[in-house]
Amino acid sequence: CTLALHGEDALDNLPTDQRLARYAQGNADNGLEELYFAFGRYLLAGCSRPGTLPANLQGIWNDDFHPAWDGKYTININTEMNYWPAEVTNLPEMHQPLFQMVKELSESAQGTARTLYDCRGWTVHHNTDLWRMAGPVDGASYVWPLGGAWLSQHLWQHYLYTGDQAFLQTAYPALKGAADFFLDFLVEHPKYGWMVCAPSMSPEQGPPGTGTMLTAGCTMDTQIVLDALTSVPVSYTHLRAHETSQDL
C-alpha cells in the first residue's frame, strides 16, 4: 500500500530535517506527506506483529526499571490511535495482537463489570497492561468505563474492511459483551431524559472553570455507546445468530 501525491522530485534530495523546516513554514511538500504515510505503516509493522504484544506508548525497547507510562496500554485514545492505520493502509495482520488483547480483556473484565457496577458484559477503564488489568487506576477522574467498548470497535472495523465471517463469529462475544454492559450501566439524565453514561468524561479534558472532568453523557462517551449498541445488531444479522434482536 503506497500513497502517491506526486511531489517535486527536487525536494526528495533534501535532508528530512530541512524538509520538515520548510513544511513548518507553510511550504507544500507532497513527497514529505508520502514519506510520513510510509513511516506510519513502518512503525506499526515494526511493533505489532502477529504473536507479539500490541503496540503501546513506550515502544518495544526499554532500558528503564520504571518505563514511561509504566509500559502499559493507555486505552482512552492512545492504543486505539496506534491502530487507526491498520485497516485503512492495508496492514490487517498487524491488528492481530490488539484483537488478542481485546479477547482476553472481554473475559477477564467481566468481573470488573460485575463487581464495580453490578452490570453484565465487560468493561475496562483508561489503562490496561500485560495482565489485562481492567479496574480504574490513578485519580478519581479516571473512573471511565468505556475503554473496552472503544477497543471492541476495532474488531468491528476489521470485519467491515474484510467481510471475514469466520472472524466476526469469534469477535461477536466481545462485541456483544461490550454492548451488554451499557444496557445495565446507562441512566436517565435528570434534566433531558436521555439515557447517558454517568459518571462520564472526555479523557484528560474538562469544561473550563469547572475544576473537574466529570459530567453526565459527554459527546465522546455517547458516540462510543452508539457504536457499540449499533454494531452488535448488525453483527447478529450478518451472522444469522440464533438470538432475537431484543436479546442483544
PLM region spans:
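Well-ordered alpha-helical segments within folded domains of soluble proteins
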Residues: 77-87, 145-156, 220-231
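Acidic/polar, glycine-enriched structural segments that form the non-catalytic walls/loops
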Residues: 1-73, 91-112, 236
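Extended, hydrophobic alpha-helical segments in both membrane/secreted and soluble proteins
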Residues: 147-158, 167-183
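Conserved small/polar residues in nucleotide/adenosyl-binding loops
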Residues: 237-244
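Active-site lining segments of carbohydrate-active enzymes
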Residues: 22-27, 84, 90-146, 150, ...
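Acidic/histidine-rich catalytic neighborhood
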Residues: 177, 181-235
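Alpha-helix capping and helix-loop boundary segments enriched in small/acidic/polar residues
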Residues: 27-28, 69-73, 86, 135-146, ...
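Acidic/His metal-coordination segments adjacent to aromatic residues that form catalytic metal sites
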Residues: 59-70, 125-142, 200-218
